[in-house]
A protein has these predicted regions:
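Cytochrome P450 core scaffold surrounding the K-helix E-X-X-R motif
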Residues: 43-49
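NAD(P)H-binding Rossmann-fold N-terminus in SDR/SDR-like oxidoreductases
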Residues: 157
Length: 158
């Protein structure tokens, strides 16, 4: 499969290379998604998770990108709630290969069904901004049921 990889932390965006990589395989509770649209922010190049795994071991060459929309092509052992051929969107794990590729292996819990009337590019643009808004309202703002919110100047992605 084609994928954009990074290998040199100091090269920044100039260090991104389009290359051939093996297609991922689905582990337990994983889903393989054929990517139709993907999101990427340049600051990912500064995140430790782009370069290391959860044990802080080097994982380069790595594939950046976290937001995605696409179609399920395979299910790992024990995966439930999704089916092959289903349209989905979601967030890839920060410490695994990302979404700047033709396929990604992702935990099923990080995906949601994408309605048929929602374009893949729209679906891929929602996860980070939606999560950021949710965290702002509920985790940081401690919003409770029945409370009101004024969204002043709500013109950005969040």
């Amino acid at each position: 499969m084609k994928a954009i990889i990074v290998t040199d932390r100091t090269a920044g965006l100039a260090g991104m290379t389009l290359t051939e990589r093996p297609e991922p395989s689905a582990a337990i509770n994983d889903v393989i998604v054929q990517i139709h649209a993907s999101g990427f922010v340049p600051t990912e190049m500064e995140w430790p998770s782009t370069w290391t795994d959860r044990r802080n071991l080097d994982r380069t060459p790595s594939i950046p990108g976290h937001e995605l929309a696409g179609v399920v092509t395979a299910l790992g052992y024990g995966t439930t709630g999704l089916s092959v051929g289903q349209r989905v969107f979601g967030l890839a794990d920060w410490h695994r290969d990302g979404t700047l590729a033709e396929y990604v292996a992702i935990e099923a819990r990080n995906l949601a069904p994408l309605p048929g009337d929602v374009d893949f590019t729209v679906g891929a643009s929602l996860p980070i901004s939606g999560l950021t808004a949710w965290q702002g309202l509920f985790q940081h703002g401690r919003l409770q049921a029945g409370q009101s919110v004024l969204a002043h100047g709500a013109a950005g992605a969040v």
